[in-house]
């Protein structure tokens, strides 16, 4: 709050720096130009606009950051002072003519009020010397005190001083024959220029109705003229030697004996009847002075009345012009239809459309001209707010990027259609397609020469898209059933956007083809066949990618695109190339075409997968063989990961293919996990046996020191343990090799189905960075390696997870053990503490005695808390 207040003070009362030089503050100046003063965030009827150009704005910043004690004319406090003076001017506008005509000498309370008002204007004279002014040549605020003083002194200072000096200061010096009081009162009318400026600002202020501002201004001008006419004419009568030869005597012979109020009302009556030219009760001049004044008064009235009538006529015509134009348009359309003998239904459509357009414009529903005049960013924001949700649910745009969807919404035009109006005609050129926002339309086909309704489109449906995307005449006539709001998208604008988003264009085309396939209409089936033929021949206007052709298995289209110079290694938004897709789909001809045109057989996608692995996991042996013959390999840094994936899917054939194509399945991934580790975790004896036959090492530890043999013992896989023993009969204990960390207890943490965690980003293959959800393994997250992989995540995060068991994402359970005082007792489940001393204290609280020994279920003594695992049974004994 303090900062904001200080910013405002910088704008209005800026600080002065060394030598009187103002510090340059371009950012602050620009901010204050747009937000401070009396300028709101959305109104620029008041305030100072910056000049064009960045350099010009910088050069003018010193004029925006005003000097010390110089007030901006746009300061809201100064504007409030100005409004206060306008109210005082309204009083002056009445009092000055009244004192001139009806008073000869000062009389309370008017004289007191006059002096109070004069005091305020005297303060304003002093204040004006400290108010910056706008240079009309450069439109910059001038804050030099000398220039401000010179400008004011050489222009309006003398008038302001004369109109402010009280009459009492020098009235006694004037001769008795001079009506000094009234003359000096009239000098105060100089202040009326403030009212004119006030109304000029109000007319530009959108918060106030322009019609009523103009009417108020004209009314005040009329009242002021009538008031002045009455006062001037009465002054002539009051100073005429013979009171009986004046216009006042026509109504009352002894009019000078009447009260001041009666005389003022009488004079106002004659003045206003003369001003309004009613023809009865006009001021009748009985002497030469009155006749001369009335002559000029009535001539002036003629001009003023012409001005008032012209203004009022213009205001009324402006209000009714829209209705008049509507009626003229309806009349012209009806005359045209009748003159050319148009069908009655077509005439009704014309009139209904024009009537609806008038309603939408008059009710503010569709101000297209105003919207088109706005900047593109504002237009886009309006369209996004109103229509994004509807367009997002349209089948044609399912799966496209948010960027393209936003751009499409920005290009759409909202239109209203009355009931029974044709939106699209059969066989017309496909220039636009439409999305339903509200309402409903009938889709009409011509069957045996008769129009029949074959379908209906409602909110969120699209029509006309087949003609636009396939570039063929529209198939159906679309006619509204009731008042409907539609979004129209021009074909040219649509194609221009899709050209810059080739991948999204393929998605849109797939959505259309799937829609045609799902349709039961025979006509749509025929269109599907024609469209697919056009795709194969490359005759579609939509930009199609190699990935689109590969996904469809369309080798003809793929060949056409490659002949046109498409990059065989181009990728989609997931980093997958056409070769990845063709290999996974089993499209052998597509694979051949891509390899012939130079596609890289070892290119990786964003997940690190290569085409050969896609062919292997998809069981496309011919593609795998073809890729291998053309140089495709499973690289050393990823083969261990692929092997683990195959084991996780219990896919023995994939492991065999890895071996077949030169992969070493005994290698480990970045966590040191081998395929044998994974096979033991899955409990798959067949795969374990196969891996052992291919040279897998059962005693090779991972980064935690766990070997496959130790895992089999821990998980209780008796058949696997027997296989290991028969393969290599050694003592069943975990072997720590040099350089490996000490074995950590098992910890259960949430994990992705694949082991993607790593020590360093450089050491990790791309495939381990992001694993596709389509390859999730159902069993791994509950396996030992799933637990350990998640534990690795915890260690890398810097927090100790030795006793942590995660649940889902972010939830951590502590490791738990069962303690008992007797071997046969069921015991109590407690949280595993960090030391044996704490465990003994817990035993004292739970069991009621202080234990001196801690034994395992098998009777072995435990002397280190680190060898206790989650779920162990502990026997606490007190030995004397």
Curated annotation (Swiss-Prot):
Residues 809-880 form the KHA domain. Residues 266-285 dip into the membrane without crossing it. Its main location: membrane. It is found in: Membrane. It is a multi-pass membrane protein. Keywords: ANK repeat, Ion channel, Ion transport, Membrane, Potassium, Potassium channel, Potassium transport, Repeat, Transmembrane, Transmembrane helix, Transport, Voltage-gated channel. Predominantly expressed in flowers. A nucleoside 3',5'-cyclic phosphate binds at residues 396-517. The chain crosses the membrane at residues 83-103, 112-132, 154-174, 183-203, 218-238, 292-312. SUPFAM superfamilies: Ankyrin repeat, cAMP-binding domain-like, Voltage-gated potassium channels. Residues 104-111, 175-182, 239-265, 286-291 are extracellular. Pfam families: Ank_2, cNMP_binding, Ion_trans, KHA. Gene3D superfamilies: 1.10.287.70, Ankyrin repeat-containing domain, Helix hairpin bin, Jelly Rolls. ANK repeats lie at residues 541-570, 574-603, 607-636, 637-667, 671-700. One of its GO terms (cellular component) is monoatomic ion channel complex. Belongs to the potassium channel family. Plant (TC 1.A.1.4) subfamily. The potassium channel is probably composed of a homo- or heterotetrameric complex of pore-forming subunits. The segment S4 is probably the voltage-sensor and is characterized by a series of positively charged amino acids. The pore-forming region H5 is enclosed by the transmembrane segments S5 and S6 in the Shaker-type (1P/6TM) and contains the GYGD signature motif which seems to be involved in potassium selectivity. Probable potassium channel. May interact with the cytoskeleton or with regulatory proteins. This is Probable potassium channel AKT5. It comes from Arabidopsis thaliana (Mouse-ear cress). The gene is AKT5.
